[in-house]
From Swiss-Prot:
Encoding gene, per UniProt annotation: dapB
Keyword Cytoplasm tagged: yes
Catalysed reactions, semicolon-separated: (S)-2,3,4,5-tetrahydrodipicolinate + NAD(+) + H2O = (2S,4S)-4-hydroxy-2,3,4,5-tetrahydrodipicolinate + NADH + H(+); (S)-2,3,4,5-tetrahydrodipicolinate + NADP(+) + H2O = (2S,4S)-4-hydroxy-2,3,4,5-tetrahydrodipicolinate + NADPH + H(+)
Binding annotation for NADP(+): R43
Keyword annotations of the record: Amino-acid biosynthesis, Cytoplasm, Diaminopimelate biosynthesis, Lysine biosynthesis, NAD, NADP, Oxidoreductase
Pathway membership, UniProt: Amino-acid biosynthesis; L-lysine biosynthesis via DAP pathway; (S)-tetrahydrodipicolinate from L-aspartate: step 4/4
Lineage: Bacteria, Pseudomonadati, Pseudomonadota, Gammaproteobacteria, Moraxellales
EC number(s) reported in the record: 1.17.1.8
Name this protein carries in UniProt: 4-hydroxy-tetrahydrodipicolinate reductase
Family: Belongs to the DapB family.
Enzyme class: oxidoreductase
Domain of life according to the entry: Bacteria
Length: 278
């Protein structure tokens, strides 16, 4: 590769490089002609520290050594991709904001304080924050908004999500995104109308509420179905993920996009240009 071509490469760092998603991200970065892996980070105490990131991802040696300190490599990257845990991502946002490094965040389960850290960081650097990076899911969000506007509160809305038995949070970030899309289209505050599962003597279903139900089992990558249940008809919008590479490739696509954007917080629909449509 010529020196001129090399200047065009986007240097990417990956948090959780040895995890399932991290390994997929490394492969996706190498598959994308615009990006190069330049930093791979694992938690302190990980047995993978010191290993070659490419060998860990089973794609061949990349000469990128896994480290346990983001600060040690922060100046080597243009953008950081973080699919980890809320507490870790909170710290990483502060480091990136201090060093003017863009971020792509796929971590879910933030509390209010961590959301405030995200908002503050996005005042200093450009950040893509999404619960799901697949094109199909983000297209589904647009369709959900259309359906919610058409039905209004005349239809009862129930969301059912299913994931593998290893997932540690529920409901999924994608389920929240779908519920938020419906609530926003209906002019509702999601926190005021959401119902998480049902048990016991719940009484009659309250009109306008949005139900969310979580299933965990096996190795399901991610299934989401939103039901609009009206008198005399039911409309279902379903997305099923069949390969994690879908999410990884989408996150890398977001990384190539965010480095060209001004400071601010964006979502995957911004990346895909879907916000240009009704």
């Amino acid at each position: 590769m010529s020196q001129q071509e090399n200047k065009k490469m986007i240097n990417v760092g990956v948090i959780g490089a040895g995890g399932r998603m991290g390994r997929m991200l490394i492969e996706a970065i190498q598959d994308n002609p615009q990006t190069a892996l330049n930093a791979a980070i694992e938690r302190q105490g990980s047995s993978l520290v010191g290993a070659d990131a490419g060998e860990v991802a089973a794609i061949g040696r990349l000469e990128v050594q896994i480290v346990d300190d983001l600060k040690a490599v922060i100046n080597d990257i243009d953008v950081l991709i973080d699919f980890s845990l809320p507490a870790a991502t909170e710290q990483n946002m502060q480091v990136c904001a201090k060093h003017n490094v863009a971020m792509v965040i796929g971590t879910t389960g933030f509390n209010e304080q961590q959301e405030q850290v995200l908002a503050k960081a996005s005042e200093q650097v450009a950040i893509v924050y999404a619960g799901n990076y697949s094109t199909g899911v983000n297209l589904s969000l647009k369709l959900l908004g259309m359906a919610a506007k058409a039905f209004g509160t005349d239809a009862d809305v129930e969301i059912i999500e299913a994931h593998h038995k290893h997932k540690i949070d529920a409901p999924s970030g994608t389920a929240y995104m779908m519920a938020e899309a419906v609530a926003e289209a209906r002019g509702q505050n999601l926190k005021e109308v959401v119902v998480y599962g049902r048990e016991g003597q719940t009484g009659a279903r309250e009109a306008g509420t949005i139900g969310i139900h979580a299933i965990r089992g096996g190795e399901i990558i991610g299934d989401h179905t939103v039901m609009f249940i009206a008198d005399g008809e039911v409309v279902e919008i379903t997305h099923r993920a069949r390969a994690r590479m879908t999410f990884a490739a989408g996150a890398v696509r977001a990384a190539t996009w965010i480095v060209q954007q001004p400071v601010g917080q964006y979502n995957m629909q911004d990346v895909l240009g879907l916000n240009d449509y009704i």
